[in-house]
Amino acid sequence: MSAAFRKAAKTRQREHRERSQPGFRKRLGLLEKKKDYKLRANDYHKKQDFLRALRKKALEKNPDEFYYKMTRAKLQDGVHIFKENKEEVTAEQLKLMRTQDIKYIEMKRVAEAKKIERLKSELHLLDFQGKQQKKHVFFFDTKKEVERFDVATHLQTAPELVDRVYNRPRIETLQKERVKGATPQTGLKRIAKERQKQYDCLTQRIEREKQLFVVAQKIQTRKDLMDKTQKVKVKKETVNSPAIYRFQTRRKR
């Protein structure tokens, strides 16, 4: 009970504060207290210990010591710079490999491939930026035929339509069919914008399908590595391809 009474008595006790800086020495600057001195002293001793340890390490250094880290380091302006290793797996690939199964990734890849085929059939890859330009080759027997050759006459179409790879009607069709009125400029812009949007979507889906294929290959490679068969790494893993191993040939029973 006495301890409880002592605590209760201390609640009404006067608070003892540390003496502030006297007015007559204010011109000399801030008066350092003991807690300030301890912080300064501890910081000083910590730095001295660190310097002492560095001097000892420099004295005891073996000039013939070697670390494998030295093979990818060089000294530039007195500073050691280490070569950065090439990224083998992206963060998105690593997340997929850790959280998803190979069957799920293969299913998503097949779904993306089907969507790509559907978009290709709708767009017919008209003026697609990633598509290789096709060539139309004409064959002739003599040089005179080559000199007299005219593309528009040969294709039986108007000269203005020669550069088209699609919707290139013949002159007979143009004479028979009724020509529709000119499309407004706003309508043409809207159609071009929608088509560009579809091409962007197609490009993204093609890239995603490639990434899913790479992830599936990397997961399969990691599964194959669980086999105890002796193997040798032939090619390192990169962002766009899995590592390649050569396994020891084993005769199956």
Swiss-Prot record:
Major location (coarse): nucleus
Highest taxon of source: Eukaryota
Family label: Belongs to the UTP11 family.
Assigned GO CC terms: cytoplasm; cytosol; extracellular space; nucleolus; nucleoplasm; small-subunit processome
Compartment(s) where it occurs, according to its Swiss-Prot or TrEMBL record: Nucleus, Nucleolus
Chain spans, region Disordered: 1-26
Lineage: Eukaryota, Metazoa, Chordata, Craniata, Vertebrata
Keywords: Isopeptide bond, Nucleus, Phosphoprotein, rRNA processing, Ubl conjugation
Function: Part of the small subunit (SSU) processome, first precursor of the small eukaryotic ribosomal subunit. During the assembly of the SSU processome in the nucleolus, many ribosome biogenesis factors, an RNA chaperone and ribosomal proteins associate with the nascent pre-rRNA and work in concert to generate RNA folding, modifications, rearrangements and cleavage as well as targeted degradation of pre-ribosomal RNA by the RNA exosome. Involved in nucleolar processing of pre-18S ribosomal RNA.
Name recorded for this polypeptide: Probable U3 small nucleolar RNA-associated protein 11
One Pfam entry name: Utp11
Modification sites for Phosphothreonine: 90
List of residues that carry Phosphoserine: 241
Subunit structure: Part of the small subunit (SSU) processome, composed of more than 70 proteins and the RNA chaperone small nucleolar RNA (snoRNA) U3.
Covalent cross-link (Glycyl lysine isopeptide (Lys-Gly) (interchain with G-Cter in SUMO2)), residues: 74, 83, 86, 103, 120, 143-144, 180, 218, 235-236
One biological process term in Gene Ontology: ribosomal small subunit biogenesis
